[in-house]
Each structure stands twice: as structure tokens, then as C-alpha cells.
């Protein structure tokens, strides 16, 4: 699953990983420092304990170092806050990005399915399903779920909600 960096309105199209770290740790405070307008950066993120936040901070190696203006309890809330707040930046799952915000490139790379699968986009992580023991040792219903999600129909469903399948 990819995490997309989104902003409200700025000349900035692309950030480096180092710039993103600097923004989220509070070192960079104004968009003019990264090629944008002279406007304060408003850092939006998920609440402590969120899996999305944990993955984002882990991927950037900044766990417990972020300085947030707002910590919100859902991806939808992050999107809405970024869309309504001048100078805002936030991270959301790739499957929820819409036209209310502007998506940013990271190190010149768009968060596309192709780039994520190729390992070229830095803010991505796999979601995995796990069982205690082999799938063949599980209840029939569990085996059926794994079989379905691995089928063409299951993969189509996963893609239909904006997620990326493992081929």
C-alpha cells in the first residue's frame, strides 16, 4: 500500500525524502524553503497509535520525532483538513487521494502502482494476511478467503477499491 503525500495549494510539485523529513520534524517551517511560496507549512498527520502514522514514520526513520499541527483520527479527516487548510501537507493511503488535494512526487517519483510494485516509491509497505500455521491447516472459511483473494475475481475487487495486488 502506498502513502501519498498531498498538499492543498503550492508551487511545490516534488519533495526529496530529506525535505519531507525536515518538514515533518519541524526543521523546515515555510514552503519557500523548498521552492514554494512564502507560506507557513501546516503539518497534518494521523493520531498516535495509527498504523498509517506508524508506517509513515518508520519508512522515513522519524518515529516519535514528528511535529504535527493536527493529529487526526482518520484518513478522511486528514484529507479534509489538508483540503481546507492553506499551506497544509499530509499523508494518506494511495487509494483515497482525490481532486481536493494536490499529490506530490517524492524524489521525482509518482506514487503509481507501477512505481510501488517496482520498489521505486519510498513510501509504500505491504499489507499481509497471516495465519498461525499453514493455510492448509486452517478452517475451511479461512482457506476460502485466501483462495478468493488470490483469484482473478478477488484481485479485481482489491484493485476496484484502489489497492495494489501482489501478482
Predicted features along the sequence, with ranges:
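Exported/periplasmic ABC-transporter solute-binding proteins
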Residues: 3, 8-167
Amino acid at each position: 500500500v502506498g502513502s501519498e503525500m498531498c498538499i492543498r495549494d503550492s508551487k511545490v510539485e516534488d519533495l526529496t525524502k530529506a525535505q519531507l523529513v525536515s518538514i515533518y520534524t519541524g526543521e523546515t517551517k515555510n514552503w519557500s524553503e523548498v521552492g514554494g511560496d512564502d507560506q507557513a507549512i501546516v503539518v497534518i498527520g494521523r493520531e498516535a497509535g495509527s498504523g498509517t502514522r506508524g508506517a509513515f514514520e518508520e519508512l522515513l526513520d522519524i518515529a516519535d520525532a514528528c511535529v504535527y499541527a493536527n493529529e487526526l483520527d482518520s484518513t478522511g479527516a486528514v484529507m479534509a483538513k489538508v483540503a481546507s487548510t492553506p499551506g497544509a501537507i499530509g499523508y494518506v493511503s494511495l487509494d483515497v487521494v482525490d481532486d481536493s488535494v494536490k499529490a506530490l512526487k517524492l524524489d521525482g517519483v509518482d506514487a503509481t502502482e507501477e512505481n510501488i510494485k517496482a520498489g521505486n516509491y519510498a513510501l509504500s509497505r505491504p499489507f499481509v494476511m497471516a495465519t498461525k500455521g499453514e493455510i492448509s491447516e486452517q478452517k475451511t472459511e479461512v482457506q476460502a478467503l485466501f483462495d478468493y483473494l488470490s483469484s482473478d475475481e478477488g484481485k479485481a475487487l482489491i484493485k476496484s477499491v484502489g489497492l495494489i495486488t501482489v501478482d
